[in-house]
Amino acid sequence: MIFIDNRQNKFDVTEELTTKLEEVISFVLKEEKVKEDCEVSLVFVDNEEIRGINNETRGIDKATDVLSFPMIDYPEDKVYKDVYLEHEFDKCYFDGDELILGDIVLSLERTKEQSIEFNHSFEREACYLVTHSVLHLLGYDHMEEEEKARMRGREEELLGKLNITRES
């Protein structure tokens, strides 16, 4: 299940946008071979709120585009499909029958700024950032160059399969 919580008032959150982002989340989970029913929360905020969360959780006092809060730990250089395809999770990882993957916090204000900066649509930027964040929930990272190349390649591959291009 995908929970969407709009905690900002600078942008209208349309049903079209939420439906598209739900489709992106579901598609990425399927492509990454997540078989369990899952729970992902997607929270929309503005730059001020994401700056506060970023400072509180990471000690970085500036706004960012998206933050990911995975509930599952991953061994170094491993992602969900490398480790957990046949894994039996403890019941503490579930809400009812759904595996809790984690939370995504997305600044719609920063999303809009970046869509202008990168000269593509707001929807394309939101889809990219949500794809990026779901991959973080599944263990992908970009701290090292090799990890970054793997993650960026996977992002582009997934967005391509969804026909979400930089021209979108």
UniProtKB/Swiss-Prot annotation:
One Pfam family of this chain: YbeY
Protein's GO biological process: rRNA processing
Presence of keyword Metal-binding: yes
Gene3D superfamilies for this protein: Metalloproteases ('zincins'), catalytic domain
Domain of life: Bacteria
Compartments in which it is found: Cytoplasm
The EC number(s) this enzyme carries: 3.1.-.-
Residue sites binding Zn(2+) per the record: H132, H136, H142
Task of the protein: Single strand-specific metallo-endoribonuclease involved in late-stage 70S ribosome quality control and in maturation of the 3' terminus of the 16S rRNA.
Annotated HAMAP family: Endoribonucl_YbeY
This protein's name: Endoribonuclease YbeY
Organism encoding this protein: Clostridium perfringens (strain 13 / Type A)
Annotated gene: ybeY
